[in-house]
């Protein structure tokens, strides 16, 4: 399993709108992608315009090819992209250890 972590900065003052938009985008678009396994979204306490989106994918290619190069990605960006204040930073991770 692959963990995608996206560090997102949104336009200040748009948090409530973005909260609804990202939930809607994941539930109606991203969750339909091949290999999508689940997600978490966290909002910054000290920086409330900063969000960390974590999406679990079956494989790296499910994100980088199937989703990013497929028909769902433009729909996703149309929902969440208008709120971005800067390009998001996205990286992928594999699990090393976890709690029980």
What are the residue ranges of the model-derived segments?
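An amphipathic, aromatic/His-enriched active-site/gating alpha helix that lines ligand/cofactor pockets
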Residues: 24, 28-36, 56-90
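Residue-level signal for secondary-structure boundary sites
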Residues: 16, 61-63, 98-100
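Feature marks short, surface-exposed loop/turn motifs that line or immediately flank catalytic pockets
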Residues: 12-14, 45-47, 61
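Short, surface-exposed ligand-recognition loops at beta-strand->loop->(often short) alpha-helix junctions
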Residues: 9-22
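Short hydrophobic/aromatic beta-strand micro-patches
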Residues: 9, 42, 54-56
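Glycine-rich beta-strand-turn "strand-cap" elements at beta-sheet edges
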Residues: 2, 40-52, 75-100
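Short glycine-/aliphatic-rich beta-strand segments at the starts of folded cytosolic domains
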Residues: 2-9
């Amino acid at each position: 399993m692959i963990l995608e972590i996206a560090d997102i900065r949104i336009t200040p003052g748009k948090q409530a709108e973005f909260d609804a938009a990202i939930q809607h985008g994941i539930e109606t678009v991203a969750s339909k992608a091949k290999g999508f396994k689940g997600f978490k979204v966290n909002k910054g306490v000290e920086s409330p315009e900063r969000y960390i989106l974590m999406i679990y994918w079956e494989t790296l290619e499910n994100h980088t090819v199937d989703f990013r190069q497929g028909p769902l990605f433009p729909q996703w960006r149309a929902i969440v992209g208008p709120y971005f204040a800067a390009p998001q930073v996205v990286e992928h991770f594999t699990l090393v250890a976890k709690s029980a």
